[in-house]
Amino acid sequence: MSDAHGIARDQLRAFIERIERLEEEKKTIADDIKDVYGEAKSMGFDAKILRKVISIRKQDADERMEQEAILDTYLQALGMIPAAETEDAA
């Protein structure tokens, strides 16, 4: 029975150590990304907009179009952008 506990303990330790290594790698990558944003900012680019562009690029084209349409609808409802002209108005 003690062998079973030893095996489980070893497996648990291995999982924990793998997770810790991955967390360290994740932090290193996050620091690298932060450095790239800083570099872009020093070249005159807006980091907030860069993040938005990256977010948009991750989206599926159909999903992005749907979100843009909903956003336009909301902005029109709030009077923040003019309503799209319909064919009936012509």
UniProtKB/Swiss-Prot annotation:
- Listed Pfam families: GapR_DNA-bd (PF10073)
Q: Which InterPro entries match?
A: GapR-like (IPR018753), GapR-like_DNA-bd (IPR046367)
GO terms, molecular function: DNA binding
Task: Give the family from UniProt.
Answer: Belongs to the UPF0335 family.
Protein name per its UniProtKB record = UPF0335 protein Smed_2680
UniProt source species: Sinorhizobium medicae (strain WSM419) (Ensifer medicae)
